[in-house]
Amino acid sequence: PSLEIVKEACINFEIPHNGIIFDPTLESWAKQGVLMINSALTCEVNKVGSHTMMWRPFMTKLLKNLSEWQTGIIYVLFGEQAKTLKPYINKNTNIILEEKHPAYYARQEERMPSTVFQEVSKLTKERYGEPIVWFSEY
């Protein structure tokens, strides 16, 4: 359900659109430099978060090295688990945004606000000249 929540937030159905094409593989996002990664890359079946501590050393080193070697990255930390990784991101040369995890909105049966996606697009346009295209219209 998290991807569906993200889809609704980035499309922002409060604004009228023509026909919408959303790439569920997120390949179109990857081509624009967007990487969506969880704080744990695996888990036991039906046990969300069961491998979080196993992946913790890898994720902390990944974020620390990435944020030191590549500056100007816009990090979006979704949820409390992701926010615990914030100290490993160099905030002096990168931007860190925070939002509740999409699963929170699914549990609450609420719509996730589109503000974080709008902010990423705004910052990307300011820094690199082009906003992120979260979906296509036809």
List PLM regions with ranges.
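C-terminal functional extensions of proteins
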Residues: 107-109, 113-138
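A polyanion-binding, active-site-adjacent surface
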Residues: 1-74, 82-89, 95-98, 104-107, ...
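Short flexible/disordered coil segments
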Residues: 94-102, 133-138
